[in-house]
Amino acid sequence: PGAEAKELFRPRVGFNVQSQVTDTLSVAAQYFFNWQSFDNQAYRYPESGTYLSVGDPLLWAGESFIVARSPFAALPGSPDYLRAWRGKDIEPDDNSGNYGLALRWSPLWADATFGAYYRRTYDMQFQLMLTPGLATTVPAATCTAIGGQPLGGTNCIINKQVTDLSLLRSKGKAGEYNAAFGEDIDMFGLSLSKQVLGVSLGAELSYRQNMPLVSEAVQVLPAPLVNRSRGQIATTEVPKSGTPGALGDTMHGIVNLLGIVGTTPLWDTATWGTELTWMTVLDVTQNEAVYKGRDNNKYLPYNLLDRPDDNFFGLAVNFTPTWFQVLPGVDMLAPMTWSAGVAGNSAVTFGGNEDGGTWSAGIAADVRQRVRFDLKYVAFFGDYTKCPRKGSPPTGFCPTGAMDVNNGVTAAISDRDFVALTIKTTF
């Protein structure tokens, strides 16, 4: 909360060019080189096992997750549970491109700057793909027909590429899961920046095509077992790049205001800012069956707490009073921030969730405008449901009282407040 943009962006290999065409018109272009040009360009999260981790199996240090109790648990040396192991990520095609063009126009009559933008990019966040190696509902005849290995009853190794009998018994490997990153996302945007009555106004509106949507894991099965109404795909349909999850066309909007409050009996000066965000899904163009906001009349219903809504609205507010020269060369500040989803759940990952967000409050010292010390308390909040799920008995995978479904990342770490000390300087 309250982080500056320059604290969040990672260096990437690429180039930017800009030209001032006229006194009021400028043109800019940027190009980032391939996905592997700087390790890779996916977002970085608090890693598996760390204090702020929200999904240990899903991050770079993730190795496996439990899927069921093992039928071989009684055998000596066999694990109690079956697991899916982390497989190779499906990354964007290096040739899919990450580039953009921008036009900015600042006519004197408007006393404002208008912008128009185009971006071709790929998603920095992933969707999940799950490839089961073991099935428990496949008759022996069907198992043999698809080239599987019958294990008795309706148990069948349906995919020998991801497991075998030895791995099942000794390691409990029942399949693999993969992170898949969307590509070929086209974004068209407009922007406005202007001073209104001493307040800085900024606004953006963007339309995105092929945008990855919040999805359940896509299952990969032998072709005869595929159920299209569940969003499943055949082993021969696994993409070499991109994602098999839900994609769609979305619209996004932002309006922000920044201002200054003059001297009062409480402070020497203060700055404030507020930002309203909005997004909506216009159309689902790929694999709606795994989209968490899917049409429940057409597909298997999804009605859990994190179901996306038609529209999402989020609000962020910050306020920082300042006291000059409380000590020679030292200015004191008290930065405070709050941000949350105020209506609806976003259809894009990390886009925001209703009643979920963060807040922070602290003190800061700016020493000779060269070194800044910040001490702040940071908290997270959000809604979640607990086990057992309504209508289901408690299980070993979801013991009574454990978190079942979290409505967004901040809900998942709502018990992990912390105090942060930051020291930064410019040189």
Show where each model-derived region lies.
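Solvent-exposed loop segments that connect transmembrane elements
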Residues: 1, 41-86, 126-177, 215-243, ...
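Short loop/turn motifs that connect adjacent beta-strands in outer-membrane beta-barrel proteins
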Residues: 24-28, 40, 106-113, 262-272, ...
